Structures are given as structure tokens and as C-alpha cells.
Amino acid sequence: AKRWVLLGTDYVYPRTTNKILNYFLKSKGVAKKDIMETYTPFGHSDYQTIVADIKKFAAGKPTAVVSTINGDSNVPFYKELGNQGLKAEDIPVVAFSVGEEELRGIDTKPLVGHLAAWNYFMSVKTPENKAFIKKWNAYVKKNKLPGGSKRVTNDPMEATYIGIKMWAQAVEQAGTTNIDAVRQAIGGQTVQSPSGFEITMDAKNHHLHKPVVIGEIQEDGQFEVVWKTDGPIRAQAWSPFIPESSKKVADWTYPWVCGNCTKAKF
């Protein structure tokens, strides 16, 4: 793509993500006039004007959309793309907040071919994921959850699974639930994830080393993995692309003991 549309819901995550993307794209030689940035309120459902603007913007050069639209609001956006005759081959969309749960029970035809970036997809074929899905299906059946057999697993579920297991391991190691003690014990903890990767909490910044997986939306509401990193990527707490944060340090070991510092505390 030569032009980029950064479209998101108006809150801190999309604005921070797009701030990083702006700096990144400009570092790759993308001109300011070739970046369109737009925000919508939570629950927004009328994308007619926005899609028309995107269509006009894309007329000059090949264009891609990075969507940080929150959850369910993605559906009317994709539908409007279809209404205006725009397919994934015309203007591909990569979303950071669309997963199996958002697609469950809706017509995915207008969404087929578009992309999503996560750390996990239900379609990942690993023994760990097979066991994870089996346990989830048994839980759904036992508790008679709405949707029954159509219930899905998704990235936030895997993230929760990893987080709880890591916390439990840290509590066992610390021998207490005291926050400070657990914080010291949790750095360096590892968990074998449903995605098949061994996930590690960084010993210093306490962010997770995780893989990046890009999936293409299918008609059945699942994703076909089209690209993934070879392994987990070391987490960076602060973006090197934003000048005001590039010198910040997140380090929970002595003498820093801080998540937002430019000099050590001790």
C-alpha cells in the first residue's frame, strides 16, 4: 500500500496505536498527505460518509486500512465497505480488535479476505489448542452457556488463561499473595500457551513475550493464518518511534523499580 487509513474508536488505545503508526510510516517514507486518520465514538454504526471518504482517498494510490475500531462497531463498517462495492482486494483492512467472538453469529460475507492481527486464533493447529478448545466446549456444555456449540475461543481468552496461570505460579513461588512479593516472583515466569508457544513474562519490564499472528477472515467466521512470527517477540513497554517515550524505561528490578522512568529510583 502507498496510502494508509488509520481508523479507530476515540479512546486511548487507538490514539496511542495510531500515534506510533504515524511515526513508523513516516520513518518508512510515507508522506503525511498519504495518511488519513479518523475516529468515531463508541457504538458508532453509520459509516456511509467515512467509507465514501476512504473510497475517495484510495482513488489516487493503493490503500490499506488499519482498524482500531472497538469490537462490534467493526461489523457496520465492513458492511458499508460491501455496500459501496469495496472488497478486500480493493482496500484491505487489518483489524486489531476483531476476533472470533465478534464474528460469531453474523454474516461474514462482507468481511471475507480482510485481516486481523492477534497472538492467537481458534484455528491454530496445536495439541495445546486442541486441549484448550475441548476444555472450553465441556465448560460451555456443563454450564449451558448461550450459543452452546457455536461458542468460540479467541485471543482475549488465551491471554486470560496465560495471565491467571502465571499469577498462580508466582504466588506459589512467593508463598504469599502479597502484591510486592508476587511482583518480584512473576518476572521470568513461563507458560505453555494454546497457540503452541512458550510465553514468558519479561524479567525486567513485566510485559509478555508473545508471537504475532495475522489471520484472514473466512466465511465460517474463523481465520486462516497467513503469517506469523517464528517465535515470541520480546515486549517493549515504550515505543522507540515516539520521541517523548523513546527514552523511557520500564524496569521492575533494582535500582529502577519503575514502569515509567527516565532515571533509576534508587
Spans of features found by a protein language model:
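Extracellular/periplasmic Venus flytrap/periplasmic-binding protein
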Residues: A1-Q84, S123-P127, A131
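Venus flytrap/periplasmic-binding-protein-like
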Residues: L86-L111, R183-Q192
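Segments of small-molecule ligand-sensing domains
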Residues: K141-M157, I164-E244, K263-F266
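C-terminal substrate-binding/catalytic core of Rossmann-like NAD(P)-dependent dehydrogenases/reductases
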Residues: K125-N143
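Ligand-binding clamshell of periplasmic/extracellular solute-binding protein-like
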Residues: V66-V75, V94-L103, V124, T160-Y161
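A short, charged
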Residues: S245-F266
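Rossmann-fold dehydrogenase core element
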Residues: T108-Y120
